[in-house]
Amino acid sequence: MMRTGGIFLKKKTKTLLTVLAVPLGVGAVSGFLTQGSMDTFEKLKQPPLTPPGWVFPVVWTGLFVMMGTASYLIAVSPKTEKRKRALILYGVQLAVNFLWPIFFFNAGWYLCAFAWLVLLWYLVYLCTKGFADISRNAGYLMIPYLVWLTFAGYLNFFIFLLN
């Protein structure tokens, strides 16, 4: 009996580590691909309220951990069509999230990046609703992500206007 419990805990631990690794991995690869463009970004005219550069990786790491935790709460919930749709939306928004910094930093397509960010915000909103329908806590964990994307949209749009 205890042995079964140990295997169960190991499976849940493996699931948790996996769902945390996915968004952190997306962020790490995206960050690696855009690191050469940070000098260009720092030379741009910045809108008011732009935080210092060190804030971005700290906030994104926290957001990736929260969204990974939210996806864990969904992944361990009973298998339903709602759960499947929510996890598909989660995967799609992660893919869209991955491409935004490439459009913004590497390509310098500020207006395109803003439109992409609006799409990302909408997908995250739908994902948050889908998560909240299954687990209220999972939905709550996604709210800071929506708030940050709203702020990122402000920064993105005004960088487009100012540059």
Residue spans for each PLM region:
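Membrane-helix boundary connector in multi-pass membrane proteins
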Residues: F104-A107, Y125-G139
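Membrane-interface helix caps and helix-loop-helix hairpins in membrane proteins
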Residues: W100-L111, I159-N163
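Membrane-interface helix-boundary motifs at transmembrane edges
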Residues: F8-K11, A75-K84, F131-G139
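Membrane-interface loop-to-helix entry segments
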Residues: P51-V65, G108-L119
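Membrane-interface helix termini and inter-helical loops of multi-pass transporters
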Residues: Q35-L49, L161-L162
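Terminal transmembrane helical module of multi-pass membrane proteins
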Residues: I134-N163
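N-terminal membrane topogenic signal
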Residues: G6-L20
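Alpha-helical transmembrane segments of multi-pass membrane proteins
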Residues: P23-D39
